Amino acid sequence: MQASPLQTSQPTPPEELHAAAYVFTNDGQQMRSDEVNLVATGHQSKKKHSRKSKRHSSSKRRKSMSSWLDKQEDAAVTHSICEERINNGQPVADNVLSTAPPWPDATIAHNIREERMENGQSRTDKVLSTAPPQLVHMAAAGIPSMSTRDLHSTVTHNIREERMENGQPQPDNVLSTGPTGLINMAATPIPAMSARDLYATVTHNVCEQKMENVQPAPDNVLLTLRPRRINMTDTGISPMSTRDPYATITYNVPEEKMEKGQPQPDNILSTASTGLINVAGAGTPAISTNGLYSTVPHNVCEEKMENDQPQPNNVLSTVQPVIIYLTATGIPGMNTRDQYATITHNVCEERVVNNQPLPSNALSTVLPGLAYLATADMPAMSTRDQHATIIHNLREEKKDNSQPTPDNVLSAVTPELINLAGAGIPPMSTRDQYATVNHHVHEARMENGQRKQDNVLSNVLSGLINMAGASIPAMSSRDLYATITHSVREEKMESGKPQTDKVISNDAPQLGHMAAGGIPSMSTKDLYATVTQNVHEERMENNQPQPSYDLSTVLPGLTYLTVAGIPAMSTRDQYATVTHNVHEEKIKNGQAASDNVFSTVPPAFINMAATGVSSMSTRDQYAAVTHNIREEKINNSQPAPGNILSTAPPWLRHMAAAGISSTITRDLYVTATHSVHEEKMTNGQQAPDNSLSTVPPGCINLSGAGISCRSTRDLYATVIHDIQEEEMENDQTPPDGFLSNSDSPELINMTGHCMPPNALDSFSHDFTSLSKDELLYKPDSNEFAVGTKNYSVSAGDPPVTVMSLVETVPNTPQISPAMAKKINDDIKYQLMKEVRRFGQNYERIFILLEEVQGSMKVKRQFVEFTIKEAARFKKVVLIQQLEKALKEIDSHCHLRKVKHMRKR
């Protein structure tokens, strides 16, 4: 508003009222004051009047003077605010207050001009008078001019607000502003806050726009700041405004107004005048927010979208070349849009009413020029109902009724705001029906007072224990959301379909120092994939892989986050989460999903375990893996007999003493730790495509380091290091009679005296296991009786007579070939174990050789097989004794042949 050069002139004397002038009536209309002609006419004909008429004329002049003084007190004009009255969404043309007139009827107060309204009608006799002339020096004394109005905005230093109830304005419920004595509140670290119902409250550094009934009022655009107010920035007063259905535009933005997808040719706002170019050099950014309009800041070119359709003629031109250097000064150009492009510097926020987004309600963030407010301990906070609230170091997405609002992703904090953490200002926010994330903790979701099984909270890391001592709590409440840490790249999904243009890029490299400053970056999202540092994962829906949902792993440049002690954790609903050193496979409803095998950790991450960084995860319907513990699975409160896990080994007890618990709970899924090779079986049949590769050679030393490799699976066989194990179901025999692969020598100490697998360490129903006793058959009972034969074969013993190997038991009944083959297969497996056994007591080997069923040729083959096994393990004494037994067999065969020839 331009001030008149006559605003400060003295009142016009009564004798000069005969001059033509314009005055303001109470309804704001201009009227020519022709009554003064009547006064002049009366003066010319005063000789014709009586003395009584002269008294009447003097009285009339006095009344005219009094009326003029009354009118003088009715009009109020301020320096910096221009306001327009709206009635039922339509501007009332005769209620616009013009600027100060050039005549002396206006009284000027310092900062406010207002008009009182009742029931949408102006009350002519209820205009609040401005400050009297004797109070002009109050501004020099530091006392501002304020007022409180009904149904109008109230302006203090940095806040203007209006209270609403049940969607209807309450005319008497306008909150008054701070008293004059509170000017120094900024110096006394008292923030400027307010509470409102159904409306946004804006503090120091925020510009916001209000919408009613989801319809913008297109004709209510407020003028931008005038050039003569540029020096206000130098005095530390930021240009702000809070408006009821209006757009607010600041310094350096050209924009174009759109209505119903069509450009309005006469609504284009001109750009800032040339005199304002230097404002950018002074550190004042160019921001704007408007209804259904495009807003473009420094470095961005964008296109407006309506109903997912591009508007071809609404493309805004890019920034002029003179502004290109802003990128070099560290000011990023980011963009978040709700079917429209709305760009701010650091954070964009969107308001939602009745579960519907209002596309033009984006709030701009703190201006770079106002960074010193943080030094004065003034936080930038706001409290809103049913709206999103964003603070400094948080990126979050708003949810309503469990459905994601796809375009409401907020960008992260820019580097300029990093020092806020050093000033002791924590990042907090409070939201209604939205997720709130704080420092390092995520917690489970509760619905209807019932806990959801997939919402196990991870423990606070040891590095964060001191937060409790600093009286900073780490808590959050969530509704159907996940928590993501530093170095995450994620993809947004809607209704099981990927949104190709909604991938959020990783944190920029210049933000890497935020981790060193102890500032976490977290976000909360619903129904999205969450990936941590060293993980590659794949999403499944209804046992079907979604081929296009593979998330790439963390970039190599983010590896140093681990060195800074920042763990990689995530909690997800209906998605797979994989931690550091784990290879796992997903099972659902007892059926394997063949395409869901996760790749193992690359070799570069092996040393993470040595640095004491634990890998934990919590998942729903997926496998969860911890370091060193396996535990028993319980189904319907009953233990599954084949799934009993051994307790933690002794060397893991020190973890409990250190306060780090390793626990895991699983439901019908596979859990595998470090060095596991496993094979999947379904319905007793081997699934040939589901064999996992063995542990690489570099992992063999894990056993020597005291780290056990175990796994527990449901309905499947589990194999550790170099042992191949096969599960039997329904008494079915595998195709081979015995396992062809043998255990490597490194695993002898692990197996110890453990029994072989159930399918291989026992005979059929008619036999008992072989032992050091000889099995003799009882003809009368068709059973094997246990007899004792004392064989003592050692290195120092004399040569052993092995005639028993070539002799048959008298009265032995005939055994079927199938049964004989089964016995011989079991004997062969037992011979392999006995040859490997440590020591030089070979008595049981010869007992087993005596039990071989078949001809002398078969027995000779078994002796030769045993010699080969002994040669593998370089058992010279056993080889010598077996060669003697082989000679006995040969001589016995020769003797039988000679006897047979004699009988002829």
UniProtKB/Swiss-Prot annotation:
Cell compartment(s), UniProt: Nucleus
Tissues expressed in: Expressed mainly in bladder, lung, head and neck carcinomas. Not expressed in normal tissues except for testis.
A Gene Ontology term for the protein's cellular component: nuclear body
Chief site of localization: nucleus
Swiss-Prot/TrEMBL keywords: Isopeptide bond, Nucleus, Phosphoprotein, Ubl conjugation
Residue ranges, compositional bias (Basic residues): 44-64
GO BP of this protein: snRNA 3'-end processing
Region spans: Disordered: 24-72
Descriptive protein name: Sarcoma antigen 1
Species assigned in the record: Homo sapiens (Human)
